Amino acid sequence: MINESMSMRNSVKAIWWAMLAVCACMVCACGNATEQSHTEQVKQHQKKVVAPKKKTVHVYFFDGFKDALGKNTIKELDEVFDSVEFEGVIPYPDSAYYAPRNRYKADKLVRHLKALQKGTSDLEIGFASKDISAAVHGHDDFGIMGWTRISLKTAVVSTFRVKGANAQNRDFFKLVIHELGHTEGLQHCKNSRTCYMRDAKGTYHLHELTDFCPTCKAHLIKRGWHLR
């Protein structure tokens, strides 16, 4: 009986140890599976996160544009974009000249710049000093400071209507950054009177602008702009 009892105890112990071993294997397997699952999730997330393409702005000076102002503006743009390339001085195209008002059609200047575009994700902008105009605000030929079409990637700006456009002029930089904002898909901003994307509506308001509002800023940061 004693031998039989001991035998039974040994059998129970063997079964118990076997069950522990199985449980341990299951825990290890579960842990490995969980670890592998987490690793796969991280890999999937990394695949989804795509860094914005390098943002390059190509700057052209139309004949007669102030060199000092242009260089200072390019220096400021360097803090916002990955790369800013000065592409040289170019003549005003005859096709853009509007003789009745002795000025240039902005849309035709932009079309001229568009033909010079370097890359599909790059931005092109022309700095002009002569008066420019466009069909806006119910007028066929309305004098403006800058022009582009939303997401066109190409713009033109002029110092003709910018007050005190000297080498250190901050208003001209605000004008440039406003038009480049349009090239990246931003409409005129109604959230803040101090946002760079506020609509001038035919008035001079550049001195009132201080920064992009949070909404406009978030939009541009997603597109690779370096904004604080």
Tell where the protein language model's regions lie, with residue ranges:
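Bacterial N-terminal signal peptides that target proteins for export
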Residues: 4-19
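C-terminal motif of bacterial Sec signal peptides marking the signal peptidase cleavage site
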Residues: 27-29
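Bacterial lipoprotein signal-peptidase II cleavage site
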Residues: 31-37
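Post-signal peptide N-terminal segment of mature Sec-exported envelope proteins
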Residues: 38-52
